Amino acid sequence: MAAAAASTKIVAVVVAVLLAILEMPSCAVARRHHHDHHDKPGHHDGGFPAVMTVNGFEKGEDGGGPAACDGHYHSDGELIVALSTEWFAGGRRCHRRIRITPSEHGRRGGGGGRRAVEATVVDECDSRRGCKDDVVDSSPAVWRALGLDTDSGEVRVTWSDV
């Protein structure tokens, strides 16, 4: 009887250890997923500090080929952006909206109107091909909505997921 009780305890311990081992990877994945964008360099509670540049999304403009998210060209009249490779996140931000807020000193280029604007991510600004790591490449419509002058070329902003 003592041998049977010892065997039962050993089996129970082995089962408990196996269950604990099987549960560990899912906890690790959940922990990584939960902190995904907040662990990125430069992220603050108010969003990601970035440099906003002007990009043409229409065929034949300086933006290059069709948008990475849908394979289409877009009107420069749309509130749309391309994000640097890390922020584009392999397409996970495709068709999602972000909120763009010019920094106070960044508003010099055109005075500034609205404090923030929401735009849709449609493309990647490829950091492996010359785009800097902190770029929000936006349509002229985004600049107009913020009351900024596109001739200034770039302006400091903060952006966040909506």
Curated annotation (Swiss-Prot):
Signal peptide: 1-30
The organism's place on the tree of life at top rank: Eukaryota
Keywords: Secreted, Signal
Keyword rRNA processing: no
Pfam entry (one): KWL1
Family of the protein in this entry: Belongs to the kiwellin family.
Name by which UniProt lists this protein: Putative ripening-related protein 7
Organism from which the protein derives: Oryza sativa subsp. japonica (Rice)
Lineage of source species: Eukaryota, Viridiplantae, Streptophyta, Embryophyta, Tracheophyta
